[in-house]
Amino acid sequence: MYPNGLFGLDALRVLISPIAIFGIIFFILYLRNDHIRAGRAVLLLLAIGVFALLGAKLFSLHVRGWEVYEPLSSELRGGLRYPGALLGMILVGPLLKRWILPDLPLPRFLDVLAITVCFCFALVRFSCFMNGCCTGPECDAIYCLSYEPGSQVWYVQLQQGLLDHSSHPSNPVFPLHILFMAASLGVGVFLMWFDTKRSFNGQIGLLFLILHDGAKAILESFRVPYVGELQLTSLSISAAGLVALIIVLYYRRVNSA
């Protein structure tokens, strides 16, 4: 899916290990005052990462109608979708935490995991920038990017008959992946700041669902080719987070009255 990229690198496979290491270090340092067991935290995050990748791959296959890339090795180069990764973490993460790191309260775990995910996905978006995926419509402004043959945007334009020859690079496209990156980074910075002002453990996790997936849902409107299931899933997750936050705030207000 991403054979060449902007600098001739398969950036996803190059960056996945450094991103994982960054996420583990960030998570442990963020909770250093909670005196968590670092070894168990590493094991927990690695296990969650496996299920996140599995969820991202399954969601990608679902969106593609369960069609596998040819050759099969191309599946290792990409074909991952964020909503599947998030759903995998939400469904399996609490259970894994209970088994591996039971001393850390679940709501606090979800708060810090949410902040960690923001920064990790901002780094993942750099691989999108390198490889030419998650782009917007064609444009001719100075900030628009053209990608080498073999990139996702090149494949799409070739299939649509927009390129004169298969040896030509893609037509310039809007760098939507940079906005995705900025959204993840911005939400992460805000959540770190708000974490010091939170009213209860778990609030940051709910705000993450609302803000991060809400922003992603808006940006999905400009993706080319547009994938409705990606936008609908992000909207649903954001709405579910908003409903959950309203319910929690209501019950907290009732109980404090």
Language-model regions: role of each:
Residues 1-257:
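Hydrophobic, membrane-interfacing alpha helices
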